[in-house]
Design a protein with these regions (language model features):
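N-terminal amphipathic/basic leader segments beginning at the initiator methionine
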Residues: 1-15
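Mg2+-dependent prenyl diphosphate-binding active-site environment of isoprenoid biosynthetic enzymes
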Residues: 12, 16-128
Length: 128
């Protein structure tokens, strides 16, 4: 299994509402910037150790990648970073308020991905 390709395909398949565009477009932009995707890959690898099909852990992998990118939106703003992975940061391309709100929305999206995870301890996991 090509984990990076699977993760990128799954991220690209996530749909967000079309409105308000100013809130959701920056999320798609941030998640499309690429990266190593180390965290979601580790989630899938850990699942592969215990189960035959690591795809069952894809919602958890998407959750951790979405959460990580939410922190990057806020971090770029706090650090006044102009570029991320060779592209303008969200607060530069849009504005600071959009970066904060889109980052907060990504946190909610991460929890939604966790809700989609099919695991026996989901309630316990979400209570943390």
């Amino acid at each position: 299994m090509d984990y990076l390709d699977s993760i990128n395909r799954a991220l690209n398949a996530v749909t967000y509402p079309s409105e308000p565009q100013g809130l959701y477009e920056p999320i798609a932009y941030a998640l499309s910037m690429g990266g190593k995707r180390l965290r979601p890959t580790l989630v899938l690898l850990a699942c592969a150790i215990y189960r035959n099909d690591p795809e069952v852990a894809m919602p958890a992998a998407l959750a951790i990648e979405t959460y990580h990118n939410h922190t990057l939106l806020h971090d770029d703003l706090m650090d006044h970073a102009d570029m991320r992975r060779g592209k303008p940061t969200v607060h530069v391309k849009w504005n600071e308020n959009t970066a904060v709100l889109s980052g907060d929305t990504m946190l909610i999206a991460a929890f939604r991905h966790l809700i989609d995870t099919n695991c026996p301890n989901k309630e316990r996991m979400l209570s943390l």
